[in-house]
Amino acid sequence: MRHGKAGRKLNRNSSARVALARAQATALLREGRIQTTLTKAKELRPFVEQLITTAKGGDLHSRRLVAQDIHDKDVVRKVMDEVAPKYAERPGGYTRILRVGTRRGDGVTMALIELV
């Protein structure tokens, strides 16, 4: 039985899932929006929202925690100095997922995930 096993495997091992989440989070925070599959967007959302909530702390410790997952210094700087203050009064829900149709090659549902 698969009870209590939250999360999606995305046909990857655990280190590849972490690498995918970090890479997509970096791209989303740099660009403001990215297009990906619906399943990947649903997995990315809590990862990014936790990063932004951590960044809202605003201190050195918060910056170092964000830098553990975002390895691009420019993106870390942007998250700490621009993104986190923007959502200072917002208690969560920093991202939005919009369906944008299906991919022609394999018919998978595509989605646009963006910062609100």
Swiss-Prot record:
Role according to the record: Binds to the 23S rRNA.
NCBIfam families per record: L17 (TIGR00059)
GO cellular component, one term: cytosolic large ribosomal subunit
Swiss-Prot/TrEMBL keywords: Ribonucleoprotein, Ribosomal protein, RNA-binding, rRNA-binding
Subunit comment: Part of the 50S ribosomal subunit. Contacts proteins L3 and L32.
Domain of life: Bacteria
Lineage: Bacteria, Thermotogati, Deinococcota, Deinococci, Deinococcales
Gene name in the database record: rplQ
GO biological process terms, semicolon-separated: translation
One example GO MF annotation: rRNA binding
Protein family according to the UniProt entry: Belongs to the bacterial ribosomal protein bL17 family.
Protein name in the entry: Large ribosomal subunit protein bL17
